[in-house]
């Protein structure tokens, strides 16, 4: 099961690639959060959380949703985070979240995507963005 939260589409793009490779399904965490839906999610044993990096960790709104939502049958959890340059110490926070949910933390992976936090950084030109992706 892939749990995806996407603000600009980068995470959704990554989640779709992972889902195709693993022949797994994606749950749209954005929709769940907007609906205040904290009902249990039937995940199977393996859960992959795909999110952008906000302030060098997963978005607080996502960690709050994960904390409140029961992941049925889940045993192992991975985190895949996209970023413009780095995810900082996100793995520490992700490991702690996994522990609180009584899940085996399998790791955090970062995927570089075109920078899109334009309040602080310049977005890359089209050719550079294509090279990154």
Where are these regions (language model features)?
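FMN-binding flavodoxin-like domain, especially the glycine-rich phosphate-binding loop
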Residues: 1-2, 6-33, 37-51, 55-133
């Amino acid at each position: 099961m892939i749990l995806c939260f996407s603000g600009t589409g980068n995470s959704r793009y990554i989640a779709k690639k992972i889902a195709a490779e693993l022949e797994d399904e994606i749950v749209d965490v954005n929709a769940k959060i907007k609906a205040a839906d904290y009902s249990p999610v039937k995940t199977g044993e393996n859960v992959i959380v795909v999110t952008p990096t906000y302030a060098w960790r997963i978005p607080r709104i996502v960690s709050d949703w994960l904390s409140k939502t029961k992941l049925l049958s889940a045993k192992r959890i991975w985190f895949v985070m996209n970023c413009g340059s780095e995810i900082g110490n996100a793995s520490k926070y992700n490991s702690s979240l996994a522990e609180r949910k009584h899940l085996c933390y399998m790791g955090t992976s970062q995927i570089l995507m075109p920078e899109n936090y334009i309040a602080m950084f310049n977005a890359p030109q089209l050719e550079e963005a294509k090279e990154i992706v």
